[in-house]
A protein has these predicted regions:
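Bacterial Sec-dependent N-terminal signal peptides
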Residues: 1-31
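Long, intrinsically disordered, low-complexity segments
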Residues: 22, 41, 261-288, 294-298, ...
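Membrane-proximal, proline-rich intrinsically disordered regions
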Residues: 23-71, 76-77, 87, 98-101, ...
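Structured, solvent-exposed acidic/aromatic patches
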Residues: 38-42, 74-375, 392-397, 486-488
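Beta-strand acidic-aromatic groove motif in beta-rich domains, primarily in extracellular
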Residues: 57-66, 147-149, 230-231, 415
């Protein structure tokens, strides 16, 4: 078995190298799903899962800058990205390519290969359902990051070399439909890709719970834009069963030895560089709360803890470093946890989307996060007993927003930023050198205006411009505390 696993990893590595060296021009991401690759579907699934967690959990600006958007970290030297300059290194273009070409394209290929093979009908249905769930998840990342994106004409260059952009709200509506269809395909107790699925081992029950949790997240996202849709979908998801324990976490098993190590280790240890310190935004929030996760989240190189001023050079030796737990090469990647789902349920109750006990869900979210990092339920109980932490329904956006933010530290900057855009908590700092607030979206790739100009202009105009402060459809100005969340 070990030899088989090693062979799979070797083939995966070869595939990843081939992908990374392919052309990154416009045709490179808008490929034709009618001409699938000759790679077996199993290897495509393994590759997509690895690529997804690599790109989304990394701290490297070559992959994403979500941990800057969440102000988890600051930079010791390079200040373009902490000050929200996405144009210099084409940050928007990099993520665009990875999501379309390296993930959605491979999943489209895998779907066609599975549809054409001779698997038993039940196995084929489970495989197709799993692929569809992954596709929907990746599409939500695209929409939540950019707003309007190519959708109906994407991945089909033989017919649409220059694809039109669909409206973000319309895409979400179709993604709900597709997720419901995927859940019909997934059979409780069924199996799909088995060992090729490194997240859930092909376990359909796990994928069903994740799909329902994703539906819940999408419903909470759209609540301020379409309360009716949000109520329907949140209720469906909750009643069908979401991730409730850490055993169901949407997590990836990075390995202790290269090449499949956690990308945080690559940037923080293997690189030999000292580029990152913890931002004052995070340090100033967690330390006064007497949070039991503090000695895990933060290194003790500076006592008392001192966060780097966000958006300006912060000498590595003078400020608090990222906790050594995040320097572990085999630390699992985490993109959805039972803790996050509990916070989503609390938010759904407060928004009137589902019935239930918001305080109970909130307490569960806090407890599960602390248990995940410290292993201590006693720590969680003592923490929740503090007046600054205990639930207060009249301040639910502050309490849920703050504790969800703390729970997502260094694991999922994207979700931390997305939650902040809805709840506007906790307070974020203005980037010191640029004077800019936290962006509401990524800008489009630098070359879209030249290559796909007509469609780019239409999409940008519909959103109020291709600007950092333009909003995706669910980020409603004036909803609740919208417009808050920023401090000098």
């Amino acid at each position: 078995m070990k030899k088989i696993n090693k062979m799979k990893k070797l083939i995966l590595l070869i595939l990843l190298v081939a992908i990374s060296t392919s052309c990154e021009d416009f045709e490179g991401w808008n490929v034709d799903k009618k001409n699938p690759s000759e790679v077996p579907a199993d290897f495509l699934i393994t590759s997509v899962e690895y690529t997804l967690f690599l790109r989304m959990t990394s701290i490297s600006v070559n992959y994403n800058i979500f941990k800057y958007f969440a102000q988890n970290v600051g930079s010791t030297t390079y200040q373009d990205e902490p000050n929200y300059d996405l144009r210099n290194r084409d940050i928007g273009g990099t993520l665009f390519i990875y999501l379309y070409r390296d993930m959605l394209n491979d999943l489209a290929d895998a779907k066609q290969i599975v549809a054409d093979n001779n698997d038993l009908a039940s196995v084929k249905a489970n495989k197709l359902g799993m692929i569809e769930v992954l596709e929907v998840y990746i599409w939500t990342i695209l929409v939540d990051t950019y707003g309007n994106v190519p959708y109906t004409q994407a991945l089909n260059s033989s017919e649409f070399l220059l694809p039109a952009y669909d409206e973000d709200e319309a895409i979400y509506g179709d993604l709900f439909r597709r997720l419901d269809q995927a859940l019909l395909f997934l059979e409780p107790g069924g199996v799909s890709f088995s060992d090729a699925d490194l997240i859930y081992g092909g376990d359909s029950d796990m994928w069903i719970a994740f799909a329902n949790s994703l539906k819940l997240k999408m419903a909470v996202r759209v609540a301020d834009a379409d309360a009716g849709m949000a109520t329907q979908k949140a209720t469906e998801a909750y009643n069908a069963g979401v991730i409730m324990t850490s055993a169901g976490n949407f997590a990836y098993p990075f390995e202790a030895s290269p090449p499949n190590t956690n990308p945080l280790w690559t940037s923080l240890v293997q690189s030999g560089r000292s580029d990152f310190i913890v931002a004052n935004t995070f340090v100033d929030l967690i330390v006064p709360l007497n949070d039991p996760r503090t000695p895990i989240y933060l290194d003790d190189n500076q006592i008392p803890y001192v966060g780097g001023i966000y958006g300006t050079n912060s000498p590595f030796a003078n400020y608090t470093h990222i906790g050594t737990k995040f320097h572990e090469s085999g630390l699992e990647g985490l993109l959805m946890s039972s803790s996050e789902v509990s916070f989503l349920l609390a938010e759904a109750v407060e928004k009137g989307l589902i019935g239930g006990d918001a305080e109970g869900f909130y307490n569960s979210g806090v407890t599960q996060s602390i248990e995940y990092w410290t292993g201590s339920s006693d720590d969680a109980a003592a923490y929740l007993a503090q007046p600054t932490v205990s639930y207060a329904s009249g301040e639910w956006k502050d309490r849920i927003g703050t504790q969800k933010y703390l729970s997502l530290y260094m694991t999922n900057g994207f979700e931390s930023w997305s939650s902040w855009r809805i709840l506007d908590y906790p307070l974020m700092n203005i980037a010191l050198e640029s004077g800019l607030p936290v962006p509401r979206r990524y800008v489009y790739p630098n070359d879209e205006a030249q290559i796909n100009g007509v469609n780019y202009e239409a999409a940008s105009s519909a959103m109020g411009g291709d600007e950092l402060d333009s909003r995706v459809f669910w980020d409603i100005t004036g909803a609740g505390n919208a417009g808050a969340g920023i401090t000098d």
